Amino acid sequence: MSLEVNITKKLDGFILHANFAARSTATAILGASGCGKSMTLRCIAGIVKPDAGRIVLDGRVLFDSAQHIDLPPQQRGVGLLFQNYALFPNMTVEQNVLCGLKAEKDKAARKARCAEMLQAMRLESLAKRYPAQLSGGQQQRTALARILVGRPKILMLDEPFSALDSYLREEVEGEVGSLLAGFGGTVLLVTHNRDEAYRLCRDMIVMDGGQVLRTGGTKEVFADPQSTTAARLTGCKNILSCTRVDAHTVRLTGWDAPLRLAAEVPETCTAVGIRAHDFAPCAPAAPNALPVQLNSTSENPFDWNLIFTAPDGTTRLWWKVSKTNLTAASPEAPAFLGTAPQNIMPLG
C-alpha cells in the first residue's frame, strides 16, 4: 500500500498545501495545533473536499480536481479515528463494532467478522458491556475495532492519546503500537507529541502553517530537521543563531566563537541546533568549547535542566543531565560546555 497526496485547501489564516507520499508503514504527521494536520486527514477521508489537487491510494484515485474525481468516504477504504471519537452509548461493545460492517449484507459473515475482531482486540469478555462500563483504554480499543472490522486500506489516527490521562496513555500507546505494527498497510498518526511520533512511527512528516517542512524516516528527521521550525517541533532546545564560515564551520552569535560541524553547512544556514542532552563539560581549549554562566536550575523526576547564558548575556543554552537515581544531586555547573561535531545540526 502507498499513499500520494498533493492538495490545496484555503483555510482561515492560511492555505493548506499538503504534498507528500506515505508508504506501507506508520507515518507521523507532526505539527503544532492548527497547522493543518487534522484537515489533511479529513481531505484524505473525503469528509472535506480540497480546492485542488490529487489523492491516490495504492494506485486508485480517490480525488482529482482536474479529472473531477471525488469518491465518497464510504468508497475510499479509509479508516479514521477522530480525536474526540464517540461510541454509541446505548449500544454494547459488540453492537458498536457491528456498526462498522453495515456494507456487509450477509448476517452470518457480519457476526463471524465481528467475533474475529473482538478476539483480535481482546474485547471478547467485554462484548456485552456498554461504553459507560469501560475504561478509557477499553473504549479506545472498541473505537479502533469498529474501524478495523471493515478492513480499511489505510488507517488514520487523529491525536489518539490526547484525551487520556497520563497514567493510561503509555498503556494504550503500547497497545496501539502493537496494532500498528501488525496492520500491514499505511498508517497516518497525527500528533503534536514528538515522543509519540518517535516511538510509534518509522516515517515522519513535519508540518507548519499548512506547509510540509520535512519528510523522511523518523530518526533521519530528528537527526537532521533542516529548518528551525522542524527542529523546535522535534524538541531541540538549543537553536543558536550563526553565520557560515566554510563548508564545515559556523560562528555563533552571542559567543563569537567558531563551531566545527560534521555535516556540510549549506549556504542558507542561519542557525544550528544542538539537543540539550548532547552537551558535556569540557576544558577551555577543547574543540567546540563554549564559555557559559549558569542562570537557573530545575529538577525533573529523571533529569536536571541547567540553563546557561552566553558571554553576551542574552543567548540561552540548555543542558539536560540524566539522573542515576531519583535522589541524585544537581550536577556542578561547568565553566565550559562542548559537543561533538556530529551533534550539531545546520538549520536554515
Place the predicted regions along the sequence by residue:
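ABC ATPase NBD Q-loop/coupling interface
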Residues: R54-R76
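ABC ATPase nucleotide-binding domain helices that frame the ATP-binding cleft
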Residues: S38-L41, R141-T142
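A position-specific signal in ABC ATPase nucleotide-binding domains
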Residues: V48-K49, V56, K102, A181
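Non-catalytic connector elements of ABC transporters
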Residues: V5-A26, L30-A32, S38-M39, G46-K49, ...
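C-terminal boundary and immediately downstream tail of ABC-type ATPase nucleotide-binding domains
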Residues: F222-D246, G273
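The short alpha-helix immediately C-terminal to the Walker A/P-loop
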Residues: R42-C43, D203
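ABC ATPase nucleotide-binding domains
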Residues: G77-G79, N90-T229
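ABC nucleotide-binding domain signature
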Residues: A28, D70-P72, R76-A86, L188
